[in-house]
Every structure is written in structure tokens, then in C-alpha cells.
Amino acid sequence: MAFPLKDDLGRAKDCWGCSSDTPALSTCSNADIFRRINAMLDNSLDFTGVCTTPNTKGKCEHLQDYPDTEGAAASRMLFSTSHEPLPRGLPDTNDLCLGLQSLSLTGWDRPWSTQDSEAGGQSSTPTAAQSVFSMLNSPMGKPSPLGFLPLDPIGSDLVEKYPTHLLRSSRFDSRSILDSRSSSPSDSDTSGFSSGSDHLSDLISSLRISPPLPFLPLGSGISRDPLRLGVGSRLDQDHAALAAATASPLGITKRWPGTSVWPSWDLLDSADDPFSIEREARLHRQAAAVNEATCTWSGQLPPRNYKNPVYSCKVFLGGVPWDITETGLINTFRVFGALSVEWPGKDGKHPRCPPKGNMPKGYVYLVFESEKSVRALLQACTQDLLSQDGLSEHYFKMSSRRMRCKEVQVIPWVLADSNFVRSPSQRLDPSKTVFVGALHGMLNAEALASIMNDLFGGVVYAGIDTDKHKYPIGSGRVTFNNQRSYLKAVSAAFVEIKTAKFTKKVQIDPYLEDSVCQVCNAQPGPFFCRDQVCFKYFCRSCWHWQHSMEILRHHRPLMRNQKSRDSS
């Protein structure tokens, strides 16, 4: 059954109110597509009032019957970014939306209209032919005739109208709306047209329509005009509805737009090496060896005046003969008391056997059972007093099978050198504490505090990390009384210390504590990013998520040294 367009006098009318003698709507570029659509609908459409051949001789002058109101002008500017009124007259078919968006989304021709209450009591669905005719018989800017079924506004019941996989997009794209299928029941009047076959969808997608509705960035400082304000506010509500209706946040993030600066959770699922963070953290501990110092301290270390010092039971033995054995060491030093030997190993560990076929690295550690044994050993050593610094070096002569009377250096540790407090009443704040690594063995807590105070100021405490025998392990902590000094020290990162006896480059990092992840606040946060852009604790997943961004990939993680935690 055909549905001709007739006026009150029985004459065929086009959609602009013109007689059939002068076709008002030139659809020549889409004529073939309209004919094929009509054929698929069993010729239920009548295009009597629609031009199918080019016509440039005349234009409809009956537009003056409908005065240009502000709403009418705005309706013609639906996709225009300019505020200037369009010239009066018939627009080109490429500029007209032709209502084709209504095939996939109701209310496209009136997106800014508030029709919620208007359409609340009506539930009937227009037929396929009526949908096409409404697009031709209701010009934009012309009031709808009485009895016209109000269309739903954009965004109403989106969750019900569109499949879930289309809604899981972080950006409300008009292209996805046009490409989506209707959710009308299969037995409804519009099911065959709206859902249709793939061939029909291809025909509709071939039609030339105007550009999609431009979206204003949310949260931007650009003010919206009254026309766009309605659209934007409705879209803002739709964004909130979509976020609430989406079952899994993971589905949203996996479909994040490619232009977003935020990373995708897909990177978490495809981590090549789950222990890459630990490896980078271990490498960072030796960063002082490959990085240049940002500042240098040179001077004289504070003098040491000990009264009845107490020593660690562990001593360092440097310059030992290369062919020395553990048996030879025990036989040489057991005259001072019972002892054991710790050989240097990888990662600062000290196994109880010589490495690689009894070949030592030139130094070992002796661990006596009593502190009195250390005192006896030092009394048997020769001392070289170091002028000005008040330091003294201890040397002991020993022999091996191939070396006779070899002098080895004995370096003890005074327990009082492990901590230095400048202000006993000052509360120590871990958030203003730095970790100092790669310390020289001659640096005690007082010397470390003096150097850091000269460089950054505000030092209230310095401590040297020790093992279970209370012997230093080459790292320390410094606490400041203000945030500025703390940040200056962290920013310095690498400091070179020059004295008359040694030159050493130390490494400064934030002091780490046991903390929860400061991103998700759910998992433990063993990884810390020292870059000022982040400067927080992360769990493994949150670290990969944040640092998968290209601008943050160069950040290196920090981890607490398990050995220092157990020993100090």
C-alpha cells in the first residue's frame, strides 16, 4: 500500500509545502538508494513528491508561510558551529540531515527538546513507512502537525535501546549510534526495517548525511550557548547513566579511545615479565656507579673521640693474601677467641665458604663470639694515626703458604657510631627521611649528618644501617626537620663526598616504609616511584597501569632492601 502525500485540495505536496510541479527536495544523489530501499519494503513508499532527477530551474517560495523563528533557524544549524543565520531558501540535500538518523535513533531532529513528560503516556511505535514519511514530511524548523507522535529525546532508555557492547565506550560517539541496531521486538512493525538485513544496513550507511553532532569536552572552560547547553546537559546525564549501567569497569577501560593519554588495562594482562619491577629496583640500588653526581661535598670529617668504646663482634679484614683459606684464617686469629669466617658473596651476602674454588676476593669478615676478642685483636694491631681527622687505621701481620708477613687491614665498628641525634627532643618524621646508599666504611652517623646538613640543612638525625652483628652494611638514613630540605636531598639523588682519605659517590632516595598502594588503597604497595610526578607507593597492578603511559615509562621503581630490613 502506498502512502501519497496530499494537501487539503488533493494535490500531491512535497515535504516543504510546494506543489508537485516544483519538487522541493532534491534527492538525486540518493535516488537509487531510495528506490532500492522501497523495493525491499515491497514498494510501500510513494516518492511522488520527491525529485529523482536534477532540477535547478526553480525553488520553493512557500517558505514564507512559516516565518523564521529562532527555533527554526537553530534547527537548521544543528551541525553548524557558527552563530550566523543561514540564508533563506532551500538547503542542499547534503546539508539536510533528511531524518535518516531517526532510523536508528528517535528524536534526532529535536535533540534539545525536553519531551520526557510529553511522550510519557504514548507507547505506540510508528511503522517503517511512517518513519520514512515523517522524515520527508516534517521539515526542520517547521512545527509538527497536530497528532504527531512525539519522539523520545536523545539518551532516554539508552541501556534498553542499544546492545551492551556498544555502551561500553568511554566516549558517546554518534557513529556508533548510527551503526547500532534497534532493539524493537522481532514481531513489531519496525523490526524488519530497523533491524533489517546487512544489505539494507549497507544501503543506509551509503546515504550522504550531515556530520555528526559535535561534542563539547566535559569540564572545559568553554561556555555553551543555549542551544548546545541542552544537548550537553542531556549528554552529561547519559554519560552518568552509561557509567552506572555498565557491569564491569574493565570493559570501559579496554575500549578507551586511542587518543586518550591514559593507558589501557590490556597492558596489565599482557605483562611480559611479572618480575620486571623487582629487577629494575635492584638495578637502581647500584645507580650511583653509573650516574653523575649533581653536587659535591669536600672537607674534613668531624674528629672522633671515644671513651671506652664498645665494638661490634664483627670486623672487616682487607688485603688478605689471595691464597688464604678458611682454615688458615681460623688458625691465625683463634688466639683472640672463638670465631667464624664470612666470605663475600653476591648481593652483599656472606657465605661461609670461599667463592670459586677457594679463591677469595681480597677481603673477608671475621665474626667473633665475644666483643672482648675484638678488643684483643685491636691491641695486637699496629696503628697508623690519621692527622686532623682523629682516625686511626689498624694493621695486622699474617702469613699464608705463598705469602709471608702480609699486612692486612682490620676495620672494627664502634656501636656509638651507628646513630647521631642533633636534637633529642625533635620528633623524627619518616616522611622527611631519606635513604643514603653506597656509603664508605669510614663514614659514621655524625659525619653523615654533618655532610647532609652542610648541603641541604635541617638535619636532626642520621643513622647507619647495620646487620645482625651490628656492623654497617653500607647504607644509612637522614631525617630533616622541614620538607624543603628533604625535597632538596631527594632531588640531588647523587652526591660526591671528597675527603683527604677517600672519595665516594653516595645515592639518596626517599626512605621507604611498609605502605598500602596509594592508588587503589586495597593492596600492599611495595613499589615506590621517586619521580615528583608520582611520588607514591604502588602495588604491582597499579604500577603497570600508571607507568604504561609513554611519558611515565622512564620512571624507575624503588623497593625496600629486605636485607637491611632484617638486619637493622
UniProtKB/Swiss-Prot annotation:
GO terms for molecular function: metal ion binding; mRNA 3'-UTR AU-rich region binding; mRNA 3'-UTR binding; mRNA regulatory element binding translation repressor activity; ribosome binding; translation factor activity, RNA binding. Zn(2+) 2 binds at residues 529, 534, 547, 555. The modification Phosphoserine is found at residues 138, 174, 210, 248. Residues 172-175, 182-191 are annotated as: Necessary for interaction with microtubules and localization at the mitotic apparatus. GO terms for cellular component: centrosome; cytoplasm; membrane; neuron projection; nucleus; ribonucleoprotein complex; spindle pole; synapse. The keyword Lipid metabolism does not apply. It is found in: Cytoplasm; Cytoplasm, Cytoskeleton, Microtubule organizing center, Centrosome; Membrane; Cytoplasm, Cytoskeleton, Spindle pole. CDD domains: Bbox1, RRM1_CPEB1, RRM2_CPEB1. Ser-174 phosphorylation by aurka in immature oocytes is essential to trigger CPE-containing mRNA cytoplasmic polyadenylation and translation activation and the subsequent signaling events that result in meiotic progression. Ser-174 phosphorylation recruits the cleavage and polyadenylation specificity factor (cpsf1) into an active cytoplasmic polyadenylation complex. Ser-174 phosphorylation increases its affinity for cpsf1 and papd4/gld2. Heavily phosphorylated by CDK1 on serines late during oocyte maturation. Ser-210 phosphorylation is sufficient to target cpeb1 for degradation. Ubiquitinated. Requires a PEST box and the proteasome pathway for destruction during oocyte maturation. Ser-210 phosphorylation triggers its destruction, an event important to allow the transition from metaphase I to metaphase II and cytokinesis in the early embryo. InterPro entries: CEBP1_N, CEBP_ZZ, CEBP_ZZ_sf, CPEB, CPEB1_RRM1, Nucleotide-bd_a/b_plait_sf, RBD_domain_sf, RRM_dom. One of its GO terms (biological process) is cellular response to insulin stimulus. Found in a complex with cpeb1, tacc3/maskin and eif4e; dissolution of this complex results in the binding of eif4e to eif4g and the translational activation of CPE-containing mRNAs. Found in a complex with cpeb1, cpsf1, the cytoplasmic poly(A) polymerase papd4/gld2 and sympk. Found in a mRNP complex with cpeb1, a guanine exchange factor xgef and mos mRNA. Interacts with cpsf1, papd4/gld2, tacc3/maskin, microtubules, sympk and xgef. Component of a ribonucleoprotein (RNP) complex, at least composed of cpeb1, lsm14b/rap55b, ddx6/Xp54, ybx2/frgy2, pat1/P100, eif4enif1/4E-T and eif4e1b. Sequence-specific RNA-binding protein that regulates mRNA cytoplasmic polyadenylation and translation initiation during oocyte maturation and early development. Binds to the cytoplasmic polyadenylation element (CPE), an uridine-rich sequence element (consensus sequence 5'-UUUUUAU-3') within the mRNA 3'-UTR. In the absence of phosphorylation and in association with tacc3/maskin, also acts as a repressor of translation of CPE-containing mRNA; a repression that is relieved by phosphorylation or degradation. Requires zinc for RNA binding. This is Cytoplasmic polyadenylation element-binding protein 1-B. It comes from Xenopus laevis. The gene is cpeb1-b.
